[in-house]
Regions:
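Short beta-strand edge/turn micro-motifs at domain boundaries
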Residues: 75, 82, 88-124
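Generic structural signal for secondary-structure transition and capping sites
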Residues: 23, 57-60, 109
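A solvent-exposed, acidic/Ser-Thr-rich amphipathic alpha-helical stretch
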Residues: 31-77
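Short, well-ordered alpha-helical segments enriched in acidic and aromatic residues
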Residues: 5, 20-36
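Eukaryotic beta-rich interaction modules
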Residues: 9, 81-84
Length: 124
C-alpha cells in the first residue's frame, strides 16, 4: 500500500479515536513507542496513553488541513507522516493550529504501529 494511502487511513482513524475515546489509541502504540507532547517525553504504550487520556479537557475536535507522507526506509516499509491542522477543545473561543509527526513501523501485512509521535501546538 502506498505511503499516502496508509497516512490517510491512519490519520482518519487516529484523530477520530483521539476525539472520541483517547484510551482507544492504546492499540496503536507498543512498549518501544515514544511520544513527545510539547516539551514532555513518554516511552511505552501505557505511559503514552495515560498521558493522552489525562489531558485536561473534556471535548476536542481535530481538523486536518494537510497530511504529507513518505516511505522512511528503503526496505522495511516504515512511513513518516506530518500532519498540520487545527484543534478546538471544550469551550475555547478559536481553533489552535498544531503540527504532529508520526513514524509508523510495519508489523505484519498492512499493519503498522506508532514508533515515534511528536506533537506541538503552533503558538507564536
Amino acid at each position: 500500500m502506498a505511503a499516502d494511502a496508509v497516512a490517510k487511513g491512519f490519520t482518519e482513524y487516529y484523530y477520530n479515536a483521539f476525539d472520541t475515546n483517547r484510551a482507544g489509541l492504546a492499540p496503536l502504540y507498543r512498549d518501544v513507542s515514544m511520544l513527545t507532547y510539547e516539551d514532555k517525553q513518554f516511552v511505552g504504550a501505557q505511559n503514552i496513553v495515560a498521558h493522552l487520556a489525562g489531558l485536561p479537557f473534556q471535548r476536542i475536535k481535530h481538523v486536518v488541513t494537510k497530511c504529507d507522507a513518505q516511505p522512511s526506509h528503503p526496505t522495511n516499509g516504515s512511513i513518516l507522516i506530518t500532519v498540520m491542522g487545527q484543534l478546538q477543545f471544550d469551550d475555547s473561543p478559536a481553533p489552535m493550529p498544531f503540527v504532529q509527526t508520526f513514524h509508523l513501523y510495519p508489523e505484519g501485512a498492512n499493519n503498522y504501529f506508532v514508533y515515534n509521535d511528536i506533537f506541538r501546538l503552533v503558538l507564536h
